[in-house]
Amino acid sequence: MLIATRNEGKTKEFRAIFDKLGYDVENLNDYPDLPEVAETGMTFEENARLKAETISQLTGKMVLADDSGLKVDVLGGLPGVWSARFAGVGATDRENNAKLLHELAMVFELKDRSAQFHTTLVVASPNKESLVVEADWSGYINFEPKGENGFGYDPLFLVGETGESSAELTLEEKNSQSHRALAVKKLLEVFPSWQSKPSL
């Protein structure tokens, strides 16, 4: 299974899930000659499809791509598909987190800072209709970062009503409940029947 990312944090989460199923997980760092796929889509699904289908065509392999992001209700769903570059192209996690806190500076009640981490997964294979699943993980945006684990907006994302940030969860805890874990769970329910479908 080739994961269409160079992000080792994301790969680690997928590897923890797919290892148990007997899949050997690679990522784009194993294929340095592959071109970068521009994420020009306006939705998570468009971006995930672009990555999965382009890389599958180039390599002839089964490819899993995800497009994930944070949707903050009071910001109309932003940062959304721009989550990784919310503070600008090439922005660090710290810069994106600072920008988000700045955007929410006048939102004083935690209940008004509701948000969802969203994942769309697309599996593409040569000559097959792509498989698409989506999932959300609901919570709130904290007033300051806390926790040392995870990546991205994890230090700001309070999980449900627990008061814990997703950066305070162990990888095992996160993989049992995160948006990515929920999407993978859905994927695993439909993957066997998709895999057994004849090619186009």
UniProtKB/Swiss-Prot annotation:
**Residues that bind substrate, according to the entry?**
T5, R6, N7, E8, G9, K10, S68, F151, G152, Y153, D154, K174, H179, R180
Give me the reactions it catalyses.
XTP + H2O = XMP + diphosphate + H(+); dITP + H2O = dIMP + diphosphate + H(+); ITP + H2O = IMP + diphosphate + H(+)
- The EC number on file is 3.6.1.66
* EC top class, as a word: hydrolase
Does the keyword section mention Iron-sulfur?
no
The biological processes this protein is annotated with in GO are: nucleoside triphosphate catabolic process; nucleotide metabolic process; purine nucleoside triphosphate catabolic process
Pfam families this protein is in? Answer: Ham1p_like
Q: Which molecular function GO terms apply here? A: dITP diphosphatase activity; ITP diphosphatase activity; metal ion binding; nucleoside triphosphate diphosphatase activity; nucleotide binding; ribonucleoside triphosphate phosphatase activity; XTP diphosphatase activity
Q: Name one GO cellular component term.
A: cytosol
Q: Which CDD domains match?
A: HAM1
Name the cofactor(s) required for activity, per the record: Mg(2+)
Q: Which residues are recorded as binding Mg(2+)? A: D67
The record places the active site at D67
Signal sequence: where?
A: none
**What are the protein's UniProt keywords?**
Hydrolase, Magnesium, Metal-binding, Nucleotide metabolism, Nucleotide-binding
Question: What does the record say about how the cofactor binds?
Answer: Binds 1 Mg(2+) ion per subunit.
The record ties this protein, via InterPro entries, to: dITP/XTP_pyrophosphatase, ITPase-like_fam, RdgB/HAM1
Purpose = Pyrophosphatase that catalyzes the hydrolysis of nucleoside triphosphates to their monophosphate derivatives, with a high preference for the non-canonical purine nucleotides XTP (xanthosine triphosphate), dITP (deoxyinosine triphosphate) and ITP. Seems to function as a house-cleaning enzyme that removes non-canonical purine nucleotides from the nucleotide pool, thus preventing their incorporation into DNA/RNA and avoiding chromosomal lesions.
Its quaternary organisation is:
Homodimer.
Similarity field: Belongs to the HAM1 NTPase family.
> What PANTHER family does the record point to?
INOSINE TRIPHOSPHATE PYROPHOSPHATASE, INOSINE TRIPHOSPHATE PYROPHOSPHATASE/HAM1 PROTEIN
Protein's recorded name: dITP/XTP pyrophosphatase
Q: Which organism is it from?
A: Streptococcus pneumoniae (strain ATCC BAA-255 / R6)
